[in-house]
């Protein structure tokens, strides 16, 4: 097979493979070994009843006992050694040629990854009809199937296993039963007994300061890149366990976040893309890390942290936009870009008009304020000039009046001044006028109580007269 076939071709929603060398895929196991693994995997226990296709186990078998009896897998995928081109790459090339000719490609013709390759037990190698490589971000735009072509369920199973839910994009895996590395913060660390009493030195033991000095100074952490883990006071233990988990899971794709719960023997691994999480779940199920533990890999439930929920919603929105853009044709993309350019131009024009209007209003406002300030300055200058003129004219008007009053006082030569004498004269004239008026008018009528009776006449007196 040529190098062009090895590199693969593009198809609707799929990207050509470039992460592996142009070589045929290696057969991971022989056909006999594969048959033995399949027979052991589907073996029916003696006390088992009907096989439940939902929970993928037999009825009548205790769940805890069944989980404890799960042994470590005999095979494991090695991406650097096992990946290569298969018949699926030829299928991708054929689909790309059909698309260039204008023929549509049905969704059921999509090419998926090999699940046996992910588990490390594919006996076909280059003759396999599935891809022997890691999935790409936009390889599988359909949310109804996983990267292996299996249909998703409407909701998660009770034990969070299986293919996942088609109503949610889950990129986080729960990894349980991991072996925690020993460190300062580990419960089984030798130095833990030295500071369980609050840092006080025990009899014949060491203090917390001795432990810190022995381990050396703490390395400086970058606040932008370092993320403190849950239930952790020092980064040494987190880094020790985190390095092990990251080394084993980073082989299956780019890791976005990793959180190790110290003292609980579990971790949460969040991949950047959901397809990588699906591949890692099948590749690491019932595997071991650096020790003989058998880890339990399941889908993680929703994070109750509001910040995490907001971040997941934003990532889902961006992923939806990328999926829509991947399914659009070049003409539709160009039309959308032109429409956005026109909208941006109209928005810029609107902003220019608004800025011009604001600039004109600011200029008129500044002009009015300058005119008011000039008028105020002129008014204050005129007021100051008028006040100075009034102050200068006041002494000249007061001097003649004082001289005239002094001359009048000298002429009279009496104890009373001229003003008092004029008032007395006016009072005398008023008294004389009132006396003359009393001579012309008749005398007033008496106002006693008998006056009305004296003027009363009876009818008998009129008759006598």
UniProtKB/Swiss-Prot annotation:
Biased composition (Basic and acidic residues): 207-225, 346-355
Protein name (database record): Pre-mRNA-splicing factor CWC2
GO cellular component: Prp19 complex; U2-type catalytic step 1 spliceosome; U2-type catalytic step 2 spliceosome
GO MF, one annotated term: pre-mRNA binding
Subunit structure: Associated with the spliceosome.
Keywords: Cell cycle, Metal-binding, mRNA processing, mRNA splicing, Nucleus, RNA-binding, Spliceosome, Zinc, Zinc-finger
PROSITE patterns for this protein: RRM, ZF_C3H1
Domain text: The C-terminal RRM domain and the zinc finger motif are necessary for RNA-binding.
Family to which this protein belongs: Belongs to the RRM CWC2 family.
Gene Ontology biological process terms from the UniProt entry: mRNA cis splicing, via spliceosome; positive regulation of cell cycle; positive regulation of RNA splicing; spliceosomal snRNP assembly
Matches recorded under SUPFAM superfamilies: RNA-binding domain, RBD (SSF54928)
ZnF (C3H1-type) ranges: 113-135
Chain positions covered by the region annotation Disordered: 1-28, 181-241, 346-371, 391-465
One Pfam match: RRM_1
Gene3D superfamilies in the record: 3.30.70.330
Annotated compartments: Nucleus
Entry annotated with the keyword NADP: no
Physiological role: Involved in the first step of pre-mRNA splicing. Required for cell growth and cell cycle control. Plays a role in the levels of the U1, U4, U5 and U6 snRNAs and the maintenance of the U4/U6 snRNA complex. May provide the link between the 'nineteen complex' NTC spliceosome protein complex and the spliceosome through the U6 snRNA. Associates predominantly with U6 snRNAs in assembled active spliceosomes. Binds directly to the internal stem-loop (ISL) domain of the U6 snRNA and to the pre-mRNA intron near the 5' splice site during the activation and catalytic phases of the spliceosome cycle.
Residue span, RRM domain: 227-302
Compositional bias (Polar residues): 1-21, 408-437
Organism: Mycosarcoma maydis (Corn smut fungus)
Composition skew (Low complexity), residue ranges: 391-407
């Amino acid at each position: 097979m040529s190098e062009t076939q090895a590199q693969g071709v593009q198809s609707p929603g799929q990207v050509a493979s470039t992460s592996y060398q142009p070589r045929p895929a290696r057969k991971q196991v022989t056909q006999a070994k594969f048959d033995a693994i399949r027979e052991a995997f589907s073996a029916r226990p003696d006390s088992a009843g009907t096989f439940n296709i939902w929970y993928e186990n037999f009825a009548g078998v205790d769940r805890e006992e069944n989980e404890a009896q799960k042994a470590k897998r005999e095979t494991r995928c090695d991406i650097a050694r096992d990946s290569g081109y298969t018949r699926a790459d030829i299928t991708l090339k054929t689909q790309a040629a059909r698309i260039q000719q204008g023929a549509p490609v049905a969704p059921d013709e999509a090419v998926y990854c090999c699940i046996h390759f992910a588990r490390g037990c594919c006996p076909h190698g280059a003759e396999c009809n599935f891809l022997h490589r890691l999935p790409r971000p936009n390889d599988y735009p359909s949310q109804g199937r996983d990267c292996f072509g299996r249909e998703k369920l409407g909701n998660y199973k009770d034990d969070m296993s299986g293919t996942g839910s088609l109503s949610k994009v889950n990129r986080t895996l729960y990894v349980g039963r991991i072996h925690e590395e020993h460190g300062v913060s580990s419960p089984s660390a030798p130095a833990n007994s030295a500071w369980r009493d609050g840092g006080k030195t025990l009899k014949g033991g060491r203090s917390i300061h001795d432990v810190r000095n022995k381990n050396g100074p703490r390395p400086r952490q970058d606040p932008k890149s370092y993320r403190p883990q849950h239930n952790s006071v020092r980064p040494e233990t987190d880094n020790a366990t985190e390095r092990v988990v990251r080394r084993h899971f980073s082989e299956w794709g780019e890791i976005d976040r990793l959180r190790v719960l110290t003292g609980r023997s579990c971790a949460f691994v969040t991949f950047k893309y959901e397809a990588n999480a699906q591949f890692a779940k099948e590749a690491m199920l019932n595997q071991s890390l650096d020790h003989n533990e058998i880890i339990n890999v399941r889908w993680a439930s929703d994070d109750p942290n509001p910040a995490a929920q907001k971040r997941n919603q934003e990532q889902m929105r961006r992923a939806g936009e990328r999926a829509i853009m991947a399914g659009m044709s070049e003409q539709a993309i160009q039309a959308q870009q032109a429409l956005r350019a026109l909208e941006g131009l109209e928005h810029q024009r609107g902003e220019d008009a608004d800025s011009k209007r604001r600039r004109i209003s600011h200029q008129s406002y500044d002009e009015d304020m300058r005119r008011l300030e000039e008028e105020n300055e002129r008014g204050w200058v005129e007021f100051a000039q008028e006040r100075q003129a009034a102050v200068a004219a006041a002494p000249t008007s007061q001097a003649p009046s004082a001289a005239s009053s002094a001359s009048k006082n000298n002429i009279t030569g009496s104890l009373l001044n001229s003003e008092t004498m004029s008032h007395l004269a006016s009072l005398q004239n008023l008294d004389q006028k009132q006396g003359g008026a009393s001579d012309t008018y008749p005398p007033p009528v008496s106002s006693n109580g008998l006056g009305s009776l004296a003027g009363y006449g009876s009818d008998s007196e009129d008759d006598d007269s």
